[in-house]
């Protein structure tokens, strides 16, 4: 209450910011008349003047009024579009590294030109990030004439582009592209074997369009580059028969074999379920009689079983995926778009392939990965724009340090948003929706019906067909026709059924969009200028008549067939109507059978309905019900925020390690000589080895000279008479013998360099270092994934899982660095090179290409009981039945005793 009083007296933070920005808008407007007197060459020449001032040290902030005024005047001349005052405010918000919330139809694409132009003057590159290739190409194509007029170059970064084209795109002043492609390019740049192969420059400034979709909705799914791993494809096919033999529990503590937790999106086997699963696996000849699924040797079997259960119980056709051309194609749960080429991890995709009876592809091993949260935090300055950010303002501030500023609309919003109607059953709900659509169609009012899945969109399309109502369907299966359908969605009486994708980025113009038709007439060379003018005038007259008819009918009517988990996505659907002061209306139709109400709010709403004694076909329409539903959505949003925050806390551990690895890798790439690094590694490895077998501050009885000589000879081809030295010099310090061994290793290395030449040896060593850095990092990612999947179980031992994860991840990282040193030293010491040609051949072998797959994948903090892809571990020894004594050499080949190496992790 006190906060509300203070807000009324002093205004909100948003109000105060807008007041500051409006003062700058006045300064920009004051420059307009002077710029209008300049000819085109003088106006375009302002860019060179600004760049010269920036080079002399002038800050971009002080240039802002002039640069924005120049950009606005250039836009008016080149494109016939003059930035509104609210668009200038939006541009300033973006330049300040904040998020601008601007309603649909307020011209976000045009707004981005202002900060893009200003920041491009510094010459460090500006990235404009969109959600798909179509929008990136479209926006770059529309805005390129403006940027080119001002003397700036524009690039488009698309998937499947050749390497040279990508380098050209990044070399441009302003680069448009998708979030996925920018992220993948960053990962690929950190896998190259030559600095010349890189495409990206240092990450300076990014403007993220639909920032809520990219930084919130997709934050739980990391970008993954993977390569094929060894995998038993037949196992998925055989395991697919097991879920049908198990019984699903109707309640968490009810009878049955497994419980499906829809809130957490997980499957859990009961004790009885484990027993029945073991019996079924024995009958299928997958498990030996008397063996347990819990044993270390059967970890992989357990993994396959859980993947099969998840595929059958949690992932449904035409909701989570579609079958297209004999392949499983994932459907994006937030946009409804098909995500061709993406695959679920942890064997889930293969399990779904087995369930649907299509060809099963091999599982992949992660080569590199990063979350959008950590990728976009690499930019020195980050900004975003969207129509719906205010509901997630807290998360933007907490995770990214981005403040959200709500920009007022250019014209008042007059759309009428009605209260939700809640029915008992889905059938009653769909009957009411059909009645509403029929009424709108008869009155000539266009309707956009939003659904949450392909399945629901096709169900509704079937009902409309039965009712004889003409309609268009816009879902992932009709992706190719998306732009055409959206263009016509504002015509009188047109009914459009759409999934969440709803053509974001494309405005629905009341009366229909005639721009493509006008463009076709203008490009038709067979017509005379008069014919063109007449046809365009006739088109515009027809459009005006349709536009007036739609306005009279009430504008675009939005119907939501159910509430989404997030209020923001509901607001996105509503935001399709009421653009630029147009009239419009919206209403959501719900039933107690909808997933959100069934899982989170059904008891409360059902109790209200029973109290009111609602007859069949009647609906509740009350602010209490709408508030109850919004509270349910807040619960889900809060839970999803916690998941994303938890994911970030875990991924920050990997991110710190990723930075170290990538930094060292870049130093190797860019340094002229790596021989000093090789020498330091060799001395470190041999010193550690010596101390392991001949411990410092120990007596002679604790030394194992024979063991050390064997390891040096076998692993490093260093022959030294250590035992003879000790006998001949009983009073010598241990360091004396260590130094002799290091000198012997150095002499052998110098002989190799002399044989092949320093330059050839440098190239070979660089290739060896990079290859082993990449290989070790690849296995380390698998180890971290394996560690993360089971870390939540530490909570049962009264330990903090996050602290345990950080501690063990650091231990694994230290072991990985030791392994890199050891393996590189072994390779350089043992490789037989007698000529520069052999060095080049060995380098080519180390630099062998491998096929890669690019995924934007599901990322879980708490996974199934077991995972795959973990490197050498104590568990693998147990599974293989190997017994290792504490003082025996570790079987991993480190040369250390088992208790000082992998025995520490046992």
From Swiss-Prot:
SMART domains: SecA_DEAD, SecA_PP_bind. Its cofactor is Zn(2+). One of its GO terms (cellular component) is cell envelope Sec protein transport complex. Transmembrane segments: none annotated. PROSITE patterns: SECA, SECA_MOTOR_DEAD. One of its GO terms (molecular function) is metal ion binding. May bind 1 zinc ion per subunit. GO terms for biological process: intracellular protein transmembrane transport; protein import; protein targeting; protein transport by the Sec complex. Keywords: ATP-binding, Cell inner membrane, Cell membrane, Cytoplasm, Membrane, Metal-binding, Nucleotide-binding, Protein transport, Translocase, Translocation, Transport, Zinc. Its EC number is 7.4.2.8. InterPro entries: Helicase_ATP-bd (IPR014001), Helicase_C-like (IPR001650), P-loop_NTPase (IPR027417), SEC_C_motif (IPR004027), SecA (IPR000185), SecA_CS (IPR020937), SecA_DEAD (IPR011115), SecA_motor_DEAD (IPR014018). It is a peripheral membrane protein. It is an enzyme of class 7 (translocase). ATP binds at residues 87, 105-109, 507. It is found in: Cell inner membrane; Cytoplasm. Monomer and homodimer. Part of the essential Sec protein translocation apparatus which comprises SecA, SecYEG and auxiliary proteins SecDF-YajC and YidC. Belongs to the SecA family. This is Protein translocase subunit SecA. It comes from Laribacter hongkongensis (strain HLHK9). The gene is secA.
